Amino acid sequence: MRVMAQMAMVMNLDKCIGCHTCSVTCKQAWTNRAGTEYVWFNNVETRPGLGYPRRYEDQEEWKGGWTLNKRGRLALKGGGRLRKLATIFSNPKMPSIQDYYEPWTYDYETLTSSPATDNFPVARPKSLLTGKNMTIKWSANWDDNLGGSREHASRDLMLKGIEEKVKMEFEETFMFYLPRICEHCLNPSCAASCPSGAIYKRAEDGIVLVDQDRCRGWRMCVSGCPYKKVYFNHRTGKAEKCTFCYPRLEVGLPTVCSETCVGRLRYIGLVLYDADKVLEQASIEDEKALYAAQRACFLDPDDPEVQRAAEAAGIPADWMEAARRSPVWALINRYEVALPLHPEYRTMPMVWYIPPLSPVVDVIKDTGFDAEDRGNLFAAIEALRIPVEYLANLFTAGDVPTVEGVLRKLAAMRSYMRDINLGRDPDESIPAAVGMDGETMYDMFRLLAIAKYEDRYVIPSAHAEQAHALEELATECSLEFDGGPGMYDSGPFGEGSGRPVPVAVENFQMLKDRQTSDTLAAPDDKATRVNLLNWDGKGVPSGLFPPRPDATPDRPDAGLTGGTGGRGSGA
């Protein structure tokens, strides 16, 4: 047994409202640079749909992920070393910019410099790649909310085998949202595909990163990743991908997409796994058994034998405590309601999903029946084959009974908790019907429905003694580069050349201090930083406004209109 730690995420798809807040904030934080205009580390897809890039799940075309060779051993679907060497200067399985979309801006100068005329000036779209006028034909979420579903959603590869049953008329279709980030797999095919060895998986927390210094822009990682979550920066000639916001995680903060999620659907936690089992379990022949095989790799943090092995492997005690409290471990192994995305790729992804019950509930509501009744929900899950089979194609390589079991648990939870919320005696036969007891089902409800911030994000901080092992951690002065303090080098392709902004863990430590502070304002040495999020609008918190000449120490808000003389009760 070789115990290793992995930071993982679970998303509850029933809570996703498709607002794209996670996508926008992620882009502003990580890819708001030249060369990454088309890059979305986080994107939200409407399903059924083509996804981003278009038809990325067609591995017969893109050759991503792993497959079993004639000897039953794992091999890259895109070929081994000889094939990659033969095509290293011209990768034939690269998605083109048309498979993503051509990024654009608008000619705003036409609007601002237009003289007074009888006609409204028009800002034409201009390509961010060529600078020429263009016609917008596609984008990262062009088919959002089933837009153009007759033409686009019908080409969704996950409808394979059930397409004759699916009708794309508005009255008969179904949909849900699927947020996607890098899976930070246990067996990443992108890392195995890189000829330069630039992609690596951190041993400390399992996050998969790209070493920008070693990357030579071969782009084999782009075609090797079956989820197409590795992108090529055409300004720097380097590959870039989701970083799981590692500088935030190192100080105990959740990722940007999780922090800003409106639906609070994301859970982040630590999972322990046996690294010696990964290759064996990923090589199982039956694709439908890969979900159970990956779960078999995970280790119970309450097992004394696992605890001893983890201590011998150098995993700190506070990380073991975080693993015991991990919501990800609970949703995957204790409640067994989370499923991996496309386990058939054999990469062992570590961003899991709770499949949505809403397509089934919506159908029951539309028929006028009670959508909270256990009998109605169970019958609908068995009768509505199209949504269930589609979810099985996404999350269990087509294993319908596993998806049905998860949906039955979610349906039972709805029915069981309705009785409790209405003051009725709880019906213990409801959780028993899905192999649970009432207390376990109530705990699952609390985690899925009303979990607090600290329950959804159980993130242990990095240890100082591991600082130099965390290769991307800034341990030198973050201002020491060409141009002086705060300046970036110009680079061969213009200012900054689209390079990522250097990060310093000190900045995220200050951010954590402000977000977890009990006071409205930061300490005296940073008095201008006021936490407006926790201000209820009553009174004037210290540091919000400059002091008035007539203010006294006991009345700092004297003379300010609307003040109540106190700093407010907070929120």
Regions found by a protein language model. Give the residues of each.
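Non-ligating segments of multi-cofactor redox enzymes
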Residues: 1-571
